[in-house]
Amino acid sequence: RDLRMSRGLGDVYKRQNYDFSTLFENVVWGNTQMFFPISLVMIGSWLIDRESTHDTLKNIMTIPVSMPKMLGAKLFWVGIFAVLLGIYSVGVTLITGLTVGLSGLTVEVFFHGGTQIVLAALTTYLVCMPLILIFGQIRGAYLGGSILAFFLGYSMLFFKGGILASIYPFSAALILVGFDMSGYAGTTTAPNPLLAVIGVGIMVLWAVLLLLMSSNKKEIKSRKQANSKGKGKRAVRRKGR
């Protein structure tokens, strides 16, 4: 039965002139629009949120690890995860296409489509870094961050032309990997790679600023902790007198 269903699905794809090239394009579009933003923001924010949930954030105050370094390390591993997720997506796409019997699989198609998927995972990660840092530092907000990432990714459909079609961060993530959005988002103007670089660059710069601001946050917490200890010692001395 499963074999017949697989063949039937393959026949449907063939009737719609579906081939491996089209399949790879659909995966790149779907990943950047929904799957990667939701997954990366949810998992990245969750990793940072563990420090607050497990009450281990206070340990940073006593060991020589700054808040920016801690957050930067977690962002780095989320980036590694994004690349691995892209490679995994390439494998699943290949297996799916072979299972349903799609045509058009060549070395060139596989290399081009697979490279676009992995690079799109990386550029989408760069765009999502500020969201990961913001919602990761708000206790229990990682689910809300993933929902916002979904809406931001889906909003690509509303920018059909002009500057916003190229500078909008999630659209820019696709433009930088050479993806043609005209057949998916209905864009009416040619993409501008320079604006795309600016769009992604703004998000990276925002993430850097958030990392720098996190050091001030740690200093404020340290001062509050020192002040509370000082007040406690003074109270003990008064009682002793």
Description of each model-found segment:
Residues 1, 70, 76-89, 145-161:
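Hydrophobic alpha-helical membrane-insertion segments
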Residues 7, 11-35, 39, 72-137, ...:
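Secretory targeting signals
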Residues 11-19, 45, 52, 59:
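Long, highly hydrophobic alpha-helical transmembrane signal-anchor segments
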Residues 11-24, 146-231:
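Terminal transmembrane helical anchor/hairpin motif
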Residues 37-52, 57, 128-143, 202-218:
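Transmembrane alpha-helical segments in integral membrane proteins
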Residues 44, 85, 89, 93, ...:
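Structural signal for membrane-spanning alpha-helices in multi-pass inner-membrane proteins
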Residues 47-79:
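Helix-loop-helix units of permease transmembrane domains in multi-pass membrane transporters
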Residues 228-241:
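Intrinsically disordered, Lys/Arg-rich low-complexity segments
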